[in-house]
Amino acid sequence: MHHNLNTKYYFISNFDTINIDQQDKSTIIIYRNYSSQKINQLAILKFKSYCRKRGLKFYLSNNVKLAIKLRLDGAYIPSFNKNFNHLNYKHDKNFEIIGSAHNLKEIRIKELQKVNKIFLSSLFKKNKN
């Protein structure tokens, strides 16, 4: 049940290779860019190649269909994504879907979404200073 707990997840919003080079092989790179509506598929493919050369897995956030199309290592479904459309898509057996949750209700939703791994994200209070 608790296998591979030494996996780290590193979230990026732009393709900056300097921070990626500092990650070890057990790190999974997750690209999430919520500030831009347009997805640059060519840049994602270049970064996929860059991560593969360094032995890192590369996941795309919140777009399972595109991650399958681009043959990435997996996809990340954030806690606010509650849809089940990805269950209709065919993917390789090595393709992994992970999700995050903040509470028990979101954990149950991720279980219904049939994600391979769920990691718990804590909720932080806003700093009032």
Kindly give the residue locations of the regions a language model identified.
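Active-site/ligand-binding-proximal alpha/beta "capping" segment
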Residues: E111-N129
